[in-house]
Amino acid sequence: MSTLNTITATLFPETDVRHLTKEELEAGLDEIRRAPKDEGLLQLIVRRPGVEQREILTEAHLDLEQGVVGDNWKRRGSSMTDDGSAHPEMQINIMSSRVVALVAQNRNRWHLAGDQFYVDMDLSEDNMPAGTRLEFGTAVLEVTAEPHLGCRKFVARFGVEAMKFVNSELGRQLHLRGINAKVVKPGVVRVGSAIRKLH
């Protein structure tokens, strides 16, 4: 597995970044809606080896039990499960590269969103409801029904208007914050791989 860079992502990463206004965010909706529906492109892979840590990868190994191999999903656990174990329906986080490009404003800040995969593809509820399967390199992922929403870290990094934007009714319909998925077939995926919706 090839690692391009290891980055420590703090909760309050910069002091000189201007967060976008509601109007500026809404102006990006048309571009987001133009994302391809059936075959997209994987633009960034991020592994989270520890809390507030990010590793930018050129490829990732996807495993049925671990999700992204080396990621802290399984070790981190979840407050949404009765026993605090990792949530099986939130194993993989995927975000639209068009959305993160809008809210982050700079590609060097994409990793701050905290997702593992950033794809140029329509992630909306209409195009990718729960149960949709995606060919991810040699692996296959299945979209789950667990919602993926902006939180306080998202506010700190991208602003309160960005959080309102992704968590709004329209934002939820378009899955602007992204989608959750799980591995149903293990394999390897690389930056630049085509991501295909399986029918």
Regions found by a protein language model. Give the residues of each.
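Metal-cofactor-dependent catalytic cores
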Residues: M1-H199
